[in-house]
């Protein structure tokens, strides 16, 4: 039986504590792309110190939120479509970010496992209580064992993963009083014009936007069959073993693989094998690549808009499942190496109006690497989080940090229920 969550205070909108500009800000072409019209939703679980005063903690969080919204005032605005439908804007009138407080009979240990269903933890961020959902919603939930869950939702079109982590660390520092607003670095930078269309017409080939035939009823299966969340932790020893396997099955002369390359390849290969797809079905692995320092000139420090493009590894089911891990890791490496300034600028043009290219869903697995964002360092005075994860575990595959083990990675993804046992078998049997 799912645990209950109950609001204990009326939801409020928290405005910036100081006056902020009343203006309309344009989001970039990358921000406005159709692919990003969804929220980033984090779940941070804290082992609250004994005797913590709930009222004092909640008040401190609320005050820190109001202060952090001064430099990040667009998060207190509202997103709207431009009149000509060419993109999105943020109307900034200090409307406020959402703040909720709740209690639950969950305990911190409940979050050590995968959720029982994709939406089991949905009530830990009750965004639907707001008639118009703000770009930022925060929910503080007191657990039955005295621990605390912090749900945070960001409008992805306003901010990306790196930007959201920078905001959360500022928010937390202000809550503890460890830093003053004037001292915090990097200062948030808007400058969304830096990733706008320049009207280029000569664009290269971008497989992430290409369509492939659905030979297996892939879309139907992922939309109609129940998805079951999974959670598996890879420690340093396991990752080293994957690197050795990859090197033993790669072309002579390859440089050692990174943990991301081998883990992504292993997850992708295990996922594909578990689904029993036709040999000729084309599969794609998509993953975000930070372009802050890949574009020329580099984006300014503190740029918190969407500054990533999708790397795309593509192959057939036959090659992915029959060739070794080294082959998979090579595909991931090649996808990373293709991304430079020219590639990124072409993506900006591709997703801009009127082209509005968007990734296909046929044969696609998407990986998002939260393990390197610094979410495990977000301390509101309750210590560092004991668990970092998503509000909802769906078909997006997430790489998550592991407490007190910087070289370990927790992998969460939901797969069709009929494939769960096979997926977990192949994950744990890299030599098979």
UniProtKB/Swiss-Prot annotation:
User: Domain of life here?
Assistant: Eukaryota
> Catalysed reaction per UniProt?
2-(methylsulfanyl)acetyl-CoA + butan-1-ol = butyl 2-(methylsulfanyl)acetate + CoA; ethanol + acetyl-CoA = ethyl acetate + CoA; butan-1-ol + acetyl-CoA = butyl acetate + CoA; butan-1-ol + propanoyl-CoA = butyl propanoate + CoA
Give the family, as the similarity comment puts it: Belongs to the plant acyltransferase family.
Task: Write out the GO biological process terms.
Answer: alcohol metabolic process; fruit ripening, climacteric; response to ethylene
- Keywords, A to Z? Acyltransferase, Transferase
Q: InterPro entries of this UniProt entry?
A: CAT-like_dom_sf (IPR023213), Plant_acyltransferase (IPR050898)
- Enzyme category, top tier: transferase
Q: Where is the active site?
A: 156 (proton acceptor), 379 (proton acceptor)
A Pfam family name for this chain? Transferase
Q: In which tissues is it expressed?
A: Expressed in fruit.
Q: What induces it?
A: Induced by ethylene in ripe fruits.
Q: What is this protein called?
A: Alcohol acyltransferase 9
Per the UniProt record, which EC number(s) apply here?
2.3.1.268
Q: Which GO terms describe its molecular function?
A: acyltransferase activity
Q: What does this protein do?
A: Involved in the biosynthesis of volatile esters which confer kiwifruit flavor. Alcohol acyl transferase that can use a wide range of alcohols as substrate to produce esters. Exhibits acetyl-CoA:alcohol O-acyltransferase activity.
């Amino acid at each position: 039986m799912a645990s209950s969550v109950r609001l204990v205070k009326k939801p409020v909108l928290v405005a910036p504590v100081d006056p902020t500009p009343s203006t309309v800000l344009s989001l970039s072409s990358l921000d406005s792309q159709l692919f990003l019209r969804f929220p980033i939703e984090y779940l941070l679980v804290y082992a609250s110190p004994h005797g913590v005063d709930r009222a004092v903690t909640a008040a401190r969080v609320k005050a820190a939120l109001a202060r952090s919204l001064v430099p990040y005032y667009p998060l207190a605005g509202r997103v709207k479509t431009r009149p000509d439908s060419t993109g999105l804007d943020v109307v900034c009138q200090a409307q406020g970010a959402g703040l909720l407080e709740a209690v639950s009979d969950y305990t911190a240990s409940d979050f050590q496992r995968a959720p029982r269903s994709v939406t089991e933890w949905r009530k830990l961020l009750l965004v639907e209580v707001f008639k118009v959902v703000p770009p930022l919603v925060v929910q503080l939930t007191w657990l039955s064992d005295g621990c605390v869950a912090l749900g945070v939702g960001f409008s992805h079109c306003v901010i990306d993963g790196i930007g959201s982590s920078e905001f959360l660390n500022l928010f937390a520092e202000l809550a503890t009083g460890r830093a003053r607003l004037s001292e915090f670095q990097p200062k948030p930078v808007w400058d969304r014009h830096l990733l706008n269309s320049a009207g280029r017409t000569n664009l290269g080939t971008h497989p992430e936007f290409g369509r492939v035939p659905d030979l297996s009823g892939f879309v139907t299966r992922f939309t109609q069959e129940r998805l079951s969340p999974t959670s598996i932790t890879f420690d340093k020893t396991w990752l080293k073993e994957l690197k050795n396997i990859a090197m033993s099955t790669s072309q002579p002369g390859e440089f050692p693989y990174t943990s991301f390359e081998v883990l992504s390849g292993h997850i992708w290969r295990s996922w594909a094998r578990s689904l029993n797809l036709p040999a000729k079905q084309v599969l794609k692995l998509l993953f975000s690549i930070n372009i802050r320092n890949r574009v020329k000139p580099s984006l300014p420090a503190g740029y918190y808009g969407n500054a990533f493009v999708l790397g795309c590894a593509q192959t057939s089911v036959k090659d992915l499942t029959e060739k070794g891990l080294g082959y998979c890791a090579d595909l991931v490496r090649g996808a990373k190496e293709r991304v430079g300034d020219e590639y990124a600028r072409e993506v900006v043009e591709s997703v801009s109006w009127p082209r509005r290219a968007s990734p296909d869903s046929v044969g696609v697995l998407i990986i998002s690497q939260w393990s390197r964002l610094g979410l495990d360092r977000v301390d509101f005075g309750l210590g560092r989080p004991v668990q970092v994860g998503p509000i909802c575990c769906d078909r997006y595959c997430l790489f998550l940090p592991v407490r007190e083990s910087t070289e370990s990675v927790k992998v969460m993804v939901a797969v069709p229920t009929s494939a769960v046992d096979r997926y977990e078998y192949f994950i744990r049997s890299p030599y098979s």
